Amino acid sequence: MIYILKNFIIILFFLLIILKRIESQSLPSLPSPTIYKSSQCRGDLVYRNVSNRMEDEKIGFTFVQYNGTYQSCVIPCPSPFFTLDEWNKFLYMSLVMGTISFLCGLFLLITYSPIVNKTHNRHTIGVMCMSFGVCLAMCSDMWNFGSNFTDQKSICPSPGQYLTTSNSRCLGSGIVLQFGGVFGFLNWTLLSFDLFMNIKGIITKNYDKYYFVATFIIAIIFTFVPIVNDQYSMSYIGLGCWLGSAVYQLIFFWILLSICLIVSSVFIILILKEIYIIIKQSKQKTSLKGNIRPLLCITVTSFAFFYMFFYYISIVIEGDYYERILNEYTDCLMDPTKDVSECKFPRMSVANEFVFLLCLRLLGIGAFIFYGINKEVKKIWLNSFWFNNSFVGKYIGSKRSMGNDITNSYASKAYSKNYNNNNSINSYNSGLELSIIDMSCNKDDNFKPIIIK
């Protein structure tokens, strides 16, 4: 198992190097856009000579049509669906929540890695893979640190230009977001599946290395196939680069996400049902409290990602409507007989978009609540080198000399009480002090399954 963990870390290390090289590779430099003020492009439209339209569209410009003819004006970046102030609020929220989610994933990754964790169980690699996926996905937000939509640090390469696959930064961040999301969701689902099968005694053999290989291959396929058709780009309602086509988004992300979410939720509810049956038979109602948190976590996470899915579906269904009002807006601006003030901005719901972008960044926080706040994590850190070295020993010794012996004694007794029977089946059938979270983190790979007759 240690050998597998070492190979896993080596693979992750080289993957990071590859992604970094993609982000920094010297792709053909984009021609410097020529942006001029022009009375022809009124309102927030941006002037761009239409003579080289085909090449300009490849690098992110969208030219306006008027009376069936392409004009030397392009759609502004960011899009007029939201005001600049609203765009900046979206960006700042994504930076804050993305950073929090990244730190949550990083904490889990470090906690369950050999850096801290001296022991391992059948779910250690799965938690590490899920945490690594979260960290990668949230890196796409952290790449936007210091950026905004109002000055030379704008995410848009130039006024009226959207990021496309031809931009190395766009390609790198899109790959990181897609791979991290798919890899994280797959491992979250397999963790719940394996835990339920193990508890029921259907699967007792450890298949973690096969799970890792399968999820890694699927994530690679779902990430790199879209590159063939240059699918990574910045949309009218996005803060960065991701799959540009609605068809690709549906096939390579949303369908998979929905399946993972439904399957994982079903398995975790079934696990909670098994625990409830055991608790009911043993007449220990107090142990139900230990499972309120995972149930709440599942409820909130399910709401978040189902909201994302249905919001996405609504955008796809209403795509023709948004395209029509955008065309009406640009036609109004191009019509010399109309005043600019008469042109109605094509607005979308700020609240719906804000919640959508927020939900995207809840995966790391949900994983932290589920796998990062439990007795086993506390035990891992207390047994690690970081709490068992000469420096910490001297610090604890000095604290004891200041009169904290009673406190330390109490903590020691509490710690002993919690973990004396950690490897015993009685901790499940009699004490029932462990919740679903602690069961998934328990280090005994060979405990007997709980079978309700």
UniProtKB/Swiss-Prot annotation:
Alphabetic keyword roster: Glycoprotein, Membrane, Receptor, Signal, Transmembrane, Transmembrane helix
Transmembrane segments: 90-110, 125-145, 171-191, 210-230, 251-271, 297-317, 353-373
Domain of life: Eukaryota
Topology relative to the membrane: Multi-pass membrane protein
Residues in the signal sequence: 1-24
Places the protein is found: Membrane
This protein's name: Frizzled/smoothened-like sans CRD protein G
Species whose genome carries this gene: Dictyostelium discoideum
